[in-house]
Amino acid sequence: MPENAWSLIFDPKYAKKLKSCGISMLDSATDVIPAALHYLGKPAYSTNPADYTEATKLMRAIRPNIKIFSSGINDLAGGGLCMALGYSGDMNIAAKRAKEGKTGQTIEALVPSTGGLLFYDNMAIPADAEHPNNAHIFINYILRPEVAASISNKMNYATMTAAALPLVDKEITANKSIFLTDDAKKKMVAQGVTTNDMRRIMTRSFTQFKTGL
């Protein structure tokens, strides 16, 4: 097992060994390319086109080892894969399904030692919304402790509603890939803003990687 979990996918030395049992990758340029840049020690949301050239070169080297492009939930749970680059919630859902379905698969969501990409789900009300009061009612409903906790318990993601924490399953609050340690939080990379030009470069890089060109 490499010290940095990213190496399991981005280092051909490890990826080749996992090819036979299956590796999946998210079908998302805005997730995969920043992850590759971060692995290379570049800014995950770089504005330097040369960085994307390096990321493309890195990913071309591992392309033969990628079996499918998907979230990996069902394939992991069913034993069709042994490694997946995916969202922590999806990986933990796969682990839960494997356990409940008694598929014989032991799945663990790994937090890379160098950190990963951090994201938040947000709720917002458009300035010109026709029924802003209804939107406030819905948001207030989602923020109810019992509702926020049920979402965490179902989706395997952390809740930012402090009052909900006592209602979240202990198995989830103890899971360090869901509720990150303070040390892990410091290493996470928040989602950055990309210009249209950089987004086009990112998409082109991912397309070249996915098609093997």
What are these regions (language model features)?
Residues 1-80:
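Extracytoplasmic ligand-binding site segments that recognize negatively charged/polar headgroups
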Residues 11-15, 19, 37-41, 64, ...:
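Sec-exported extracytoplasmic/periplasmic mature domains
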Residues 29-32, 89-92, 114-117, 130, ...:
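Solvent-exposed loop/turn segments at secondary-structure junctions
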Residues 52-61, 70, 103-127:
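Periplasmic-binding protein-like
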Residues 72-73, 81, 135, 148:
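Short, hydrophobic alpha-helical packing/hinge segments within bilobed ligand-binding/sensory domains
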Residues 74, 182-213:
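Conserved C-terminal helix/tail region of periplasmic/extracytoplasmic solute-binding proteins
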Residues 83-104:
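A ligand-binding cleft/hinge motif common to bilobed small-molecule-binding domains
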Residues 126-187:
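Mature extracytoplasmic/periplasmic domains
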